[in-house]
């Protein structure tokens, strides 16, 4: 929603994985929220600390999704169903709608659970759980994208 927890973590983790795979010239990675509450802010300090514990630096500044992003990017991934619905409302045609899906569609362990839980109102354990989900999903996303050339 506000682009300070889950999506900037996914951005940073995916960027790190892509760099380590030497595929960084193949991807343009961006993160944004569906609401503008935190525009210009760094990610939540608890999320940054969790990422730092795993060797990931989160320096992204929050921004809000724009309608033009749906033209500019090949894939738009939402962290939960509420964000998915909000992003779909911005779509102006079938091509844009087809780009939008849930991030955890790429999680091999997401049996019956399609959303990345929002850790914002919880404790440190929730941030670690989100990190594990995002890291696993980001790795599988890269494999899918480089193997199947979506």
Walk through the language-model features, giving the residues of each:
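Helix N-cap/beta->alpha junction signal
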Residues: 7, 80-81
